[in-house]
UniProtKB/Swiss-Prot annotation:
Assembly and binders: Homodimer.
Alphabetized InterPro entries for the sequence: Aminotransferase_I/II_large, DapL/ALD1, PyrdxlP-dep_Trfase, PyrdxlP-dep_Trfase_major, PyrdxlP-dep_Trfase_small
Keywords: Aminotransferase, Chloroplast, Plastid, Pyridoxal phosphate, Transferase, Transit peptide
Catalytic activity: (2S,6S)-2,6-diaminopimelate + 2-oxoglutarate = (S)-2,3,4,5-tetrahydrodipicolinate + L-glutamate + H2O + H(+)
The protein's Enzyme Commission number: 2.6.1.83
Name used for this protein in its record: Probable LL-diaminopimelate aminotransferase, chloroplastic
Annotated localization: Plastid, Chloroplast
Residue interval of the organelle targeting sequence: 1-39
Domain of life of the native organism: Eukaryota
MF annotations from Gene Ontology: L,L-diaminopimelate aminotransferase activity; pyridoxal phosphate binding
Family designation: Belongs to the class-I pyridoxal-phosphate-dependent aminotransferase family. LL-diaminopimelate aminotransferase subfamily.
Predominant localisation class: plastid
Length: 464
């Protein structure tokens, strides 16, 4: 049966939203050491804004969650995808280079995929098959995480909960905390902290004049304060979301700064949710874990992920550390309640992805991940050198895969549009990370080397 014209139009609309990125064909001056001889074409399907639903005459009697109505427009990255798709409709032949969403691009090292393939093949045998695993993660992987990242820090394998990624665990932690808490976030910060807080009913309405939600404490992080908040001016909150190295600014907190943060949490009886997703990018003596700070086990939870180390953005594997020393106000262990949340809401990470995690933590896997991180850090240097040569002030980059570029006095969405329109390069507007991001754009170093070089050329041409 032939498709109707309407159906064809709908299909065209959908395909424009889920089409793979179009990359430049410009080649680097030397071959990529991480690139395989041949690469299969990839189709990236994103969570993008849905087209308006066709009106129907029937409505259920189920009320909408009022908290969903508080959310502002679309989530940041789907909105960027929508604008990118619209740009392609306007310029169908454009070779768009994406330096926007922080998605990895380089192949997962063989030592890691071989471990996953071996586990996957074993599932086809009687002896190798396994069904549901422990919701908290496989004992061997939890032990390996503890030994690799928390040796001598007093963190045990039973404190570690393996997950399908840090972002998912952030929402599970929000379920754990409930709706009757007040949170603080760095400003700017990763949007998932604020949006999950809104969905949980922890916030007031969005205040358009200041671009903030009520009942959230926005801790300003700017070049003027070294991207670390003035804690003396921050009121008490129950939960403090803190990411270091920070997304989007790329700033890594020093040992002295984190010591102040832990003391601040202790003085106020708060819990820190410490996002260490980019810790492996730290190249100086900045702490890679909050638990390097004395007393942190009594006030902190740490989330982490293999996504940006091993290219697991699609594989999905991370972990959260909830120390047994961390207690609620009534003396009940936080870990016991989080374990109940995990057992209720989650059946455990894929056994194949966990096999990949063990591959990551083998000596060969750790070396391979270090090489991948080094590759992206080389990309970061190219981006930094490009903007610096053009006279821009740039921040971050040293300990993170993000470059935070300042466009004083300009609207960050306008800068995003200018770069997309004139250079066909996607960045991320800083205001999408909070009001403190206005006047900045985040440029991601996740990209193939030839695309980073070509993007640098276009940016130099645009702003020369």
């Amino acid at each position: 049966m032939a498709a109707s014209p309407a159906a064809g139009a709908a299909a065209a609309t959908v395909s424009s939203f889920v089409s793979p990125s179009s990359f430049s064909s410009v080649k680097a001056s030397k071959p990529d050491r991480l690139r395989p001889a041949r690469r299969a074409a990839a189709v990236n399907v994103r969570c993008v804004s849905s087209p308006p639903a066709t009106e129907t005459s029937f409505k259920t009697k189920v009320p909408r969650n009022a908290n969903m109505a508080k959310l502002q427009a679309g989530y940041l990255f789907p909105e960027i995808a929508r604008r990118r798709a619209a740009h392609l409709l306007k310029f169908p032949d454009a070779k768009i280079i994406s330096l926007g969403i922080g998605d990895t691009t380089e192949p997962i090292p063989d030592v890691i995929t071989n471990a996953m393939a071996k586990r996957a093949h074993a599932l086809s045998t009687v002896d190798g098959y396994s069904g549901y695993g422990a919701e908290q993660g496989e004992k061997k992987l939890r032990a390996a995480i503890a030994a690799t990242y928390y040796a001598d820090l007093g963190i045990e394998e039973t404190d570690i909960f393996v997950s399908d990624g840090a972002k998912c665990d952030i929402s599970r932690l929000q379920v754990l905390f409930g709706s009757n808490v007040k949170i603080a976030v760095q400003d700017p910060s990763y949007p998932a902290y604020v949006d999950s807080s809104v969905i949980m009913g922890q916030t007031g309405l969005y205040q358009e004049d200041v671009q903030k939600y009520g009942n959230i404490e926005y801790m300003k992080c700017s070049p003027e304060n070294g991207f670390f908040p003035d804690l003396s001016s921050v009121p008490r909150t129950d939960i403090i979301f803190f990411c270091s190295p920070n997304n989007p600014t790329g700033a890594a907190a020093s040992r002295d700064q984190l010591t102040k943060l832990v003391k601040f949490a202790k003085d106020n009886g708060s819990i820190i949710v410490y996002d260490s997703a980019y810790a492996m990018y730290i190249s100086d003596d900045s702490p890679k874990s909050i638990f390097e700070i004395p007393g942190a086990k009594e006030v902190a939870i740490e989330t982490a992920s293999f996504s940006k180390y091993a290219g697991f953005t699609g594989v999905r594997l991370g972990w959260t550390v909830v120390p047994k020393e961390l207690l609620f106000s009534d003396g009940h262990p936080v870990a016991k309640d989080f374990n109940r949340i995990v057992c209720t809401c989650f059946n455990g990470a894929s056994n194949i992805s966990q096999a990949g995690g063990l591959g990551c933590l083998s000596p060969e896997g750790l070396k391979a991940m270090s090489d991948v991180v080094g590759f992206y850090k080389e990309n970061t240097k190219i981006i930094v050198d490009t903007f610096t040569s053009l006279g821009f002030n740039v921040y971050g980059a040293k300990n993170a895969p993000y470059v935070w570029v300042h466009f004083p006095g300009r609207n960050s969405w306008d800068v995003f549009a200018e770069i997309l329109e004139k250079a066909h390069v996607v960045t991320t507007p800083g205001s999408g990370f909070g009001p403190g991001g206005e006047g900045f754009v985040r440029v991601s170093a996740f990209g193939h080397r030839e695309n980073i070089i070509e993007a640098a050329r276009r940016l130099k041409q645009l702003y020369k």
